[in-house]
Amino acid sequence: RSAGEVSWRLALIVVIGRIVLNESPSDMLAGLVRAFGRDEAEAGALACRILAHRGSIDPRCPAPGFALDGRIFVAPGQLAALSGTDPDLLAALMPHVTVHSGAFGIDPGAATREALLAVPGHSPGLVDHFLARRAMRAAQGEDASVYDMLPPSRYLTASPGEVFTIHAEAVLPGGTVQRVERVVRLTGEPQRPWRTLAWRSQPPRRLPAPR
């Protein structure tokens, strides 16, 4: 880019393609952790801590040793407050979790590879084959449902297309990067077609100097 020019990058993400912290069952939560190469013990432990935070009981989880919190997550970043959470794992999970869709499952038409791998019974080969076919349909402009390309599962659901995350990234002159994220819900009301559910801004950072 030329001196003095500001470059922008925008991304629109369907929220229901993410794992929902307040609704998803323990096997989905653990599956997402395993998608990042963590073992069964670590995946199960984090899933149980998430359930304990929201006051859910799973017979596969050990007794927490404290009163269940019974609180909902209001932002994905609250995962950092759970004891024993690995910061590197937390950073990896953030793009694949949400608190806004309120759905039990995920929409395969919008889900990331990692979210699809969290579904019980989904192997890497199955997911990669599905993603290739999904991309092919999109490239051909086909609007047909993608549900016929995966085995039936109670963890897959249709998206009403009401909640979206908008990512905006600006690279300013001098190499400073500013990122903001807004979560919006479409209302269907002409006077107020959308409303903001969340707004997050990351501290500015500088790009490394070219070598």
Question: What does each of the following model-derived ranges do?
Answer:
Residues R1-R211:
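Compositionally biased linear targeting/interaction segments
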